[in-house]
Amino acid sequence: MNDVTSCGALGNNRLAGQTCRLALRLDGTIGSKQISTDPDWMAQALSEAYSALVLASPNPRVGCVIVGGDGRLAGSGYTQRAGGPHAEVMALRDAALRGHSVEGATVYVTLEPCAHQGRTGPCCDALIKAGVAKVVAAVPDPNPLVSGQGFARLRAAGVSVEIGPGATASRELNLGFFSRMVRNIPWVRMKVAASLDGVTALQNGSSQWITG
């Protein structure tokens, strides 16, 4: 990973996203390049979300990075196991552990901050309480319990809200979640192994290895 341009274009590449995240320093640089654009920072948030790939279910895989007023990385995090902290709270905790203030900061998150009380409190309230100035989200949350309410509460508290880049990558990372919320059915993946002539066993009924 040699420059910020390649980092910002990561979007849909899981492995590249993880590599890019590991290369990001707390001063907001990768190599000698300074990260400064919304696509660059959202790429970092998406790479955090990929860290929750096998962890967050049945919750969506969400990543978050917080950028201080000086343009440097203040904190980052991703959604933990069901019932555990969401990405925004993890990023706030990370910033606190590092001794960074998030007052007036910009938050990049891959899904609209939640606005309902479940096993954890509303993430939008945590961001408001922390004093962040702006939230850039990749995509609205299709959950009927949220569905724009997170954005509304943030705006009502004086926090600037933008729908930023990364929508496609965020949805693709959470196909099952979006399918359940929007269509009320799970996203089913099926693999069929067949020979070139369309059969799955020999004529005598015995099976053979077709795929690994």
Question: Model-found features: residue ranges?
Answer:
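Mobile, glycine- and charge-enriched loop segments
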Residues: 92-117
